[in-house]
């Protein structure tokens, strides 16, 4: 009898303690939004290492085309990556560097310097060579965070095969006849006759090596998965063994006549259409003054729990839409592009069932006693986040930065 009374008393005590442990504050949606907007204001300034917004200057009548080109390339690259992750059910890394990264674009030197230029007399049917001059960035070698090689695949109606697997290699400086002449980077399957598309490759390691060792910058090689031929980089010579030719065509690399049929007017029009699609590198660097702060305040990786999809109509934890208009919501005119973005936020209850027949609730009760201000119950927090690219002005100087973890894509109870 005494045992039953004691058990009932203990159970009542544990339930009461468990209820008292839910210390996550509950706010109405308007208050959530206001707090989220203010958090974004501080987040952007913090990532840019600014204590206050830049002084307002008259907006330029026209942004230089090369600046717009870098911004568009960076924005498109992030959108492509997000689409690929969504298709593959992958998540954005949440342990990226906190501070904003400066973005630089390095175009490949043109093969055809003028409209009337004659293509090279030699034709490489099995591969393409692409080179970049990164010497201007050597002083910032240690600040490199990411490097992407982007090349635009053109539609080739003349292609004899509809699909090919192309591979990207870093050309190596061979020390002797037995040493390797190339290093594999990545591969992609492309449809040669389909509409054109941008192809992106992560070349961080290769560019990092070039920045530290200028003599090793011999460029990239684009070839087929199994060309079955020997490549000699010293004289750009190959020994073919009935190799399959590379049917994919690339803007800025292949002459217009190799993939376009028609008169000179058609060829000229096609060349003009593809003039802004030159192969290029996108380098993302952390400025020195931010690099020092990053190294001294390195954030720890967060464990990613299982993701669950919630509808916004629910009261439980889920992703809530929130569009931030920089001018309207923050009173800022200094960010030129974009005008705003979908920041989103996480809100809602996180139901948690305590088990009275285990020691878990007792431990949590003790934890709450020792840490009365802490939350022992799960709270609704962001899980997957994506970066944001902005174009802004400091005085009359345009700057392009990539801000990590700015767009909330999913939530979790943690």
UniProtKB/Swiss-Prot annotation:
GO terms for cellular component: extracellular matrix; extracellular region; extracellular space
Subunit text: Interacts with the serine proteases, HTRA1 and HTRA3. Interacts with ASPN. Interacts with MFAP5.
Domain of life (superkingdom): Eukaryota
Gene designation: TGFB2
Record's keyword terms, sorted: Cleavage on pair of basic residues, Disulfide bond, Extracellular matrix, Glycoprotein, Growth factor, Mitogen, Secreted, Signal
A GO BP entry: positive regulation of cardioblast differentiation
Protein's recorded name: Transforming growth factor beta-2 proprotein
Organism listed in the record: Mustela putorius furo (European domestic ferret)
Glycosylated residue positions: 72, 140, 241
Pfam families linked: TGF_beta (PF00019), TGFb_propeptide (PF00688)
InterPro entries noted in UniProt: Cystine-knot_cytokine, TGF-b_C, TGF-b_propeptide, TGF-beta, TGF-beta-rel, TGFb2, TGFb_CS
Family label: Belongs to the TGF-beta family.
One GO MF term attached to the UniProt entry: cytokine activity
Phylogenetic lineage: Eukaryota, Metazoa, Chordata, Craniata, Vertebrata
Signal sequence, start to end: 1-20
PROSITE patterns from the UniProt entry: TGF_BETA_1, TGF_BETA_2
S-S pairs: 309-318, 317-380, 346-411, 350-413
